[in-house]
């Protein structure tokens, strides 16, 4: 059952170990492999600098190897398959060569190089190392500028990452901190704490209390991805609805790259609002639009059922904007016999049983 992440925080843990894993079946192994312990999985640039030069700090007991997930943008989306195959081969060679920490990085992104989506690269490498029987010999650390939100971290952890450095998010925090009256250290600490709380909440929904149990568990469901694509790069993830595949996913990354580096000179230094969190006229679509909110407010102020019906139509009829799976479906009414309204309990009677804690009560 789910865990209450606040009241039951005592049984939760974000501790992560980076590096080789001990053989759980070898009860006589008195010298298990050394691992790096981190109290939470979000790493700063200073932490990454130590990992990049970990051999010098540990007399060669740990050795790290970078895996660059970028490739020339002029290869287009067609270059992604060969690049992933090359990354997988490099990873296996590195493990067999004695490296026990692999750093998946997109820092080489430039005008001429585009990055493979970091979740795709991480999951592909994680799966390939498992299939080659060497996954427990190495730790996976992600260094990416595309990781920002809690769910980004949760997905990476769920598909094999042991720690993540969101370097662009951290750089953004440091640039914004003085404007908010914060020190850079406080801003970063607040962000790390917030992501940690979010990860605990995500795990708690599935009844998982420790990050070590959540890592690599792949407790997700894919929506809008092709079955063969998911089977190849996200093995074990259910996908009940078809959709786009590898090349379409990479084409979106290429399009974003070209939009970023091909920006109008007059817009230099400015970023489009995007509208991911708050509605914008030229941004991402939202279910809650200004029109819908106005209709709802007017219906309650004027006690107008007609206005409420207009609001309900905007929310319920999703076939026009097709933002959800429900918007792609239709009710099967052929051969159905409607129930007479006289046999249905009136709405006025139903709402009397409504309570604020109804969902908690069950």
What residue ranges belong to the model's regions?
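Alpha-helix-loop-beta-strand connector modules within alpha/beta enzyme cores
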Residues: 114-142, 190-197, 201
């Amino acid at each position: 059952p789910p865990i209450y992440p606040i009241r039951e925080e005592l049984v939760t843990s974000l501790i992560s170990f980076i590096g080789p894993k001990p053989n759980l079946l070898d009860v006589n192994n008195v010298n298990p492999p050394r691992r790096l312990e981190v109290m939470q999985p979000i790493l700063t640039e200073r932490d990454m600098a130590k990992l990049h030069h970990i051999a010098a700090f540990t007399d060669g007991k740990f050795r790290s190897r970078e895996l660059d997930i970028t490739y020339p943008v002029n290869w287009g989306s067609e270059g992604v398959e060969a690049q992933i195959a090359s990354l997988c081969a490099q990873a296996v060679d590195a493990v067999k060569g004695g490296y026990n920490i692999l750093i998946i990085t997109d820092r080489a992104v430039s005008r001429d190089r585009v990055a493979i989506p970091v979740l795709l690269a991480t999951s592909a490498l994680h799966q390939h190392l498992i299939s080659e029987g060497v996954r427990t010999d190495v730790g996976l650390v992600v260094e990416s500028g595309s990781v920002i939100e809690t769910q980004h971290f949760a997905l990476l952890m769920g598909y094999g990452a042991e720690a993540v450095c969101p370097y662009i998010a951290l750089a953004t925090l440091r640039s914004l901190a003085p404007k908010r009256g914060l020190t850079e250290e406080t801003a970063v600490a607040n962000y790390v704490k917030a992501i940690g709380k979010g990860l605990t909440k995500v795990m708690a929904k599935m009844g998982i209390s420790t990050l070590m149990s959540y890592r690599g568990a792949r407790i997700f469901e894919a929506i809008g991805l092709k079955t063969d694509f998911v089977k190849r790069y996200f093995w074990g993830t259910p996908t009940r609805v078809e959709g786009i595949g590898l090349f379409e996913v990479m084409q979106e990354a290429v399009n974003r790259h070209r939009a970023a580096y091909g920006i109008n000179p007059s817009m230099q230094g400015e970023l489009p609002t995007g509208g991911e969190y708050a509605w914008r006229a030229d941004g991402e679509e939202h279910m809650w639009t200004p029109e819908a909110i106005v209709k709802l407010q007017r219906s309650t102020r004027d006690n107008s059922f007609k206005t409420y019906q207009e609001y309900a139509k905007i929310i319920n009829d999703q076939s026009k904007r097709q933002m959800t799976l429900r918007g792609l479906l239709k009710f099967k009414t052929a051969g159905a016999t409607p129930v007479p309204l006289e046999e249905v309990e009136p709405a006025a009677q139903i709402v009397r049983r409504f309570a604020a804690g109804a969902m908690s009560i069950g």
